Amino acid sequence: LYSEVEMSKVTTQIVKPPICEEEPKGMAAKSLDHCLLYGTNAGETIQWFREVVGFAMAECVYKPDGSILVAWLTGSNKAHDVAILDYDKPGKLHHVGFNLEDWSAIGHAADIIGRYGISLDIGPTRHGITRGQTIYFFDPSGNRCETFAGGYAYMPDQPLRHWDADHVGEGIFYYDKVLNDRFLSVVS
């Protein structure tokens, strides 16, 4: 038995084949998840979010003098809705985070970042603080964005989780445990 078949017009690319055969349909962000704000008077700002907005502090990093370097605050059962970092300039945005379903969705977001040549900052990786999985990247205007999945469920009666400044690298980037200058200094 023998048959001749015409080659399909749609074929798998064999030279530099893409990860995905079909164009991806976006990162599938479920919602805006959180933001990290940099500014002067972090202690006062943290207190303002707690007293005026009604947020609770779920986690923090202490400076050697015992003051707070950065705090993760929540008004829900998420590990954080906003984080506040003590910085030498007022009113800066470090990043906006988008909520994704799970670690697999973070991988899909990484595929999209690679496919479209999006400026990657860090990741995929995982946070020690909040326990979330993440990728940081830049939008076309230069603003840092994050995809975020997972994290623990915050309960109002749980004790404050805290870190010291010597271990903040592990808290932010659990796998390699190192912060880089660009991650700390590039703000909008």
Question: In which residue ranges do the predicted regions lie?
Answer:
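Vicinal oxygen chelate
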Residues: L1-A28, S31-T40, A71-W72, K89-S188
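A conserved beta-strand-loop-helix scaffold within acyl/acetyltransferase catalytic domains
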Residues: S3, C60, K78, Y87-D88
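Catalytic cores of nucleotide-enabled group-transfer and carboxylate-activating enzymes in metabolic
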Residues: K16-C20, G26-A29, T45, V53-F55, ...
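Core segments of cupin and vicinal oxygen chelate
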Residues: L37-A79
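Conserved active-site tyrosine of GNAT-family acetyltransferases
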Residues: T45-R50, I113, F137, G142
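A short beta-turn/loop motif at secondary-structure boundaries
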Residues: K63-D65, D88-P90, R126-T130
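Conserved beta-strand in the GNAT
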Residues: V82-I84
